[in-house]
Design a protein with these regions (language model features):
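Active-site-lining helix/loop region of Rossmann-like oxidoreductase modules
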Residues: 1-88
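C-terminal active-site/capping subdomain that shapes the small-molecule cofactor and substrate pocket
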Residues: 53-166
Length: 166
């Protein structure tokens, strides 16, 4: 049955989806990645016209009404401050900043559903690389396409000098 209960396996999923998270979307390839994960890699390269961009996704099926959520890790060419990133995002059309984790304010798909904006938050420096940024992003994927979102973010990053113009 749709949604499934413990021990009941809907034909759509290999395991129960109710009260569960499945760490794959689509079929697995010989590389260990799924078709959906490779689609993310290929779309990123196509959108930015740059096959050298490193992308290492893991797609996860989460039983929510709608929307896509992403944990994003970026490495910039130059140093940045979290305040600069927050200010840039706050002033980017189509982006809503929700970044006050101490008060449990961060993007969630439940509140993005039916809205056109992309919601971003949980900004923090990535300690594993020199100029790295980690953040959380959610959007209603029926309202905001991945390509539109990526282009808008890239344009703002180029404008602020975090990415090269070429």
């Amino acid at each position: 049955r749709a949604g499934g209960k413990w021990g009941e396996y809907p034909a759509v999923y290999p395991h129960p989806i109710d009260q569960n998270i499945l760490p794959h979307i689509d079929s697995f390839l010989e590389t260990g990645y799924t078709k959906e994960e490779m689609k993310m890699v290929n779309e990123t390269h196509k959108i930015f016209a740059d096959d050298s961009i490193g992308v290492s996704p893991t797609t996860v099926r989460v039983p929510v009404q709608g929307g896509h959520s992403e944990s994003i890790n970026l490495e910039f060419e130059k140093e940045f401050t979290l305040e600069d990133v927050r200010e840039m995002m706050k002033n980017t059309p189509g982006v809503t900043l929700q970044d006050d984790p101490a008060n449990c304010v961060y993007p969630m798909p439940l509140y993005a559903w039916g809205k056109n904006d992309v919601f971003v938050g949980r900004f923090r420096k990535d300690p594993s690389v020199k100029s790295g940024l980690n953040f959380w992003c959610v959007a209603d994927n029926l309202r905001k396409g991945a390509a539109t979102n990526a282009v808008q973010i890239a344009e703002k990053l180029i404008e602020k000098g975090f990415l090269p113009k070429e």
